[in-house]
């Protein structure tokens, strides 16, 4: 196993522990708590994949961070902070919408890269809107936290989420996953729209009513990708 993979996991575990202590003092805002919950799932998946205990990794990560801080000068820290581009966290969904459990009558699931696409193929003839929470850097989607498909009644009928065991994805990965979800939903004569935030940063190809146009051939291709169950 690559040593950098192990040490990266150890540092991530310790930093998550620090953030959790911060949240326990009721100091975190909604985006902070949302990322904390998502990162916890990611760490569990990575720990399982690597065969590493999170508690042991957290203690090792603490030693690594302490060693770095001992060697870090205030001036070097200022220069590092100044060179890192600031990311923005954008939210279409409330914390309740993100954390709500949902169920599928005809569940379909597929994996697209490091993203998992889930949808209920029992849904027909509905008006559906896609909402997402994600971070943006340089006006481009950086990290998708969660995307969900809602009916006009507020029911959740689809979802795109990062796989905890496969961290890392590009804005193009997200766009392809959105296309797959849309194609699967439209196959059952649903009308799908994308939120303004998603149009701007993740989809970038929609008509005037916010409904991304997909040619019939592409729709059929996208729908077929949804058909494969995991």
From Swiss-Prot:
Keywords: Eukaryotic host gene expression shutoff by virus, Host cytoplasm, Host gene expression shutoff by virus, Host mRNA suppression by virus, Host nucleus, Host-virus interaction, Inhibition of host innate immune response by virus, Inhibition of host interferon signaling pathway by virus, Inhibition of host PKR by virus, Inhibition of host pre-mRNA processing by virus, Inhibition of host RIG-I by virus, Inhibition of host RLR pathway by virus, Interferon antiviral system evasion, RNA-binding, Ubl conjugation, Viral immunoevasion. Residues 1-73 are annotated as: RNA-binding and homodimerization. A motif (Nuclear export signal) lies at residues 137-146. GO terms for molecular function: protein serine/threonine kinase inhibitor activity; RNA binding. It comes from the Viruses. It is found in: Host nucleus; Host cytoplasm. A motif (Nuclear localization signal) lies at residues 34-38. Signal peptide: none annotated. Residues 223-230 are annotated as: PABPN1-binding. Its main location: host cell. One of its GO terms (biological process) is symbiont-mediated suppression of host PKR/eIFalpha signaling. GO terms for cellular component: host cell cytoplasm; host cell nucleus. It holds the Pfam family Flu_NS1. Inhibits post-transcriptional processing of cellular pre-mRNA, by binding and inhibiting two cellular proteins that are required for the 3'-end processing of cellular pre-mRNAs: the 30 kDa cleavage and polyadenylation specificity factor/CPSF4 and the poly(A)-binding protein 2/PABPN1. In turn, unprocessed 3' end pre-mRNAs accumulate in the host nucleus and are no longer exported to the cytoplasm. Cellular protein synthesis is thereby shut off very early after virus infection. Belongs to the influenza A viruses NS1 family. Homodimer. Interacts with host TRIM25 (via coiled coil); this interaction specifically inhibits TRIM25 multimerization and TRIM25-mediated RIGI CARD ubiquitination. Interacts with human EIF2AK2/PKR, CPSF4, IVNS1ABP and PABPN1. The dsRNA-binding region is required for suppression of RNA silencing. This is Non-structural protein 1. It comes from Influenza A virus (strain A/Turkey/Ontario/7732/1966 H5N9). The lineage of its organism: Viruses, Riboviria, Orthornavirae, Negarnaviricota, Polyploviricotina. The gene is NS.
